[in-house]
C-alpha cells in the first residue's frame, strides 16, 4: 500500500494548531478544511491530463485538462464532512458520494448505516475523507462498500493516522493509497489516537 505522510511546513503548522485542547469550533473547522485541501493537492498529483484546444484572448490556444471522468469525494459521516469543503476547493466539479459508518464505542467495531454513491463510481477515482484513521474499521468498511459498487481507484485522505489503523487498512486493502498529515504514536486503551486531535467530529460540529 502506498503511504504518504505529507510533511509540508504548512501542513505541519496547521495540524499543530488543531491539536490545541481549547481550540474553537470555528478554528478547528477552518483548519480541517485547509489541511484537507493541501492533502488533496498531493493526492491528485498523478491525475492524467489531455491536451485540448480552446479559444483564447488572441485566438486558439492548446491547454491541458484532466482526462475523462474525474473524482468522487466520499466523506465518511459525520466527521468527514469537515474536510469536504477543502477537497472541493481543488476539485470543484467532483461528485459527492456519502457513506455513514460509526464506531461502536464498546466493541470498537464499525457499524455501516447509510450509503449514497454516484451511479458511475466505477468510472471515477474515489477520495475517501475522514479526519482520523484509528483502528481502521470504519475506513475498511467504507472501502468494502465502494469496491462492491465497482470502484477501482481509491485514495484515502486523513488528518492523522495510527500505525494500528494503517496496518489494518493495508492488510484489508493493499491496493489503496493513503495520504495523511501525520502518523501519530498509536492508540490508547479506548481506541483513541495519541496524541491525536481529540474527538474530531465533536470539534467540527461543536458538540464537544
UniProtKB/Swiss-Prot annotation:
**What is the enzyme's main class?**
transferase
Q: Can the keyword Cell division be found in this entry's annotation?
A: no
The pathway to which it is assigned is: Pyrimidine metabolism; UMP biosynthesis via salvage pathway; UMP from uracil: step 1/1
Q: Which reaction does it catalyse?
A: UMP + diphosphate = 5-phospho-alpha-D-ribose 1-diphosphate + uracil
The source's superkingdom equals Bacteria
Q: Which CDD domains match?
A: PRTases_typeI
Any inhibitors or activators noted? Allosterically activated by GTP.
Amino acids binding 5-phospho-alpha-D-ribose 1-diphosphate: 78, 103, 130-138, 199
Q: What residue range is the signal peptide?
A: none
What does the record list as GO biological process?
A: UMP salvage; uracil salvage
What are the UniProt keywords, alphabetically? Allosteric enzyme, Glycosyltransferase, GTP-binding, Magnesium, Nucleotide-binding, Transferase
Chain sites annotated for binding uracil = 193, 198-200
Q: What's the Enzyme Commission number for this chain? A: 2.4.2.9
How are cofactors bound according to the entry's free-text note?
Binds 1 Mg(2+) ion per subunit. The magnesium is bound as Mg-PRPP.
**Would I find Magnesium among this entry's keywords?**
yes
Q: Which GO terms describe its molecular function?
A: GTP binding; magnesium ion binding; uracil phosphoribosyltransferase activity
* Reported cofactor(s): Mg(2+)
Q: Which InterPro entries match?
A: PRibTrfase_dom (IPR000836), PRTase-like (IPR029057), Upp_B (IPR034332), UPRTase/APRTase (IPR050054), Ura_phspho_trans (IPR005765)
The family this protein is said to belong to: Belongs to the UPRTase family.
Could you tell me which HAMAP family the record lists for this protein?
Answer: Upp_B (MF_01218_B)
What is the role of this chain?
A: Catalyzes the conversion of uracil and 5-phospho-alpha-D-ribose 1-diphosphate (PRPP) to UMP and diphosphate.
What is this protein identified as? Uracil phosphoribosyltransferase
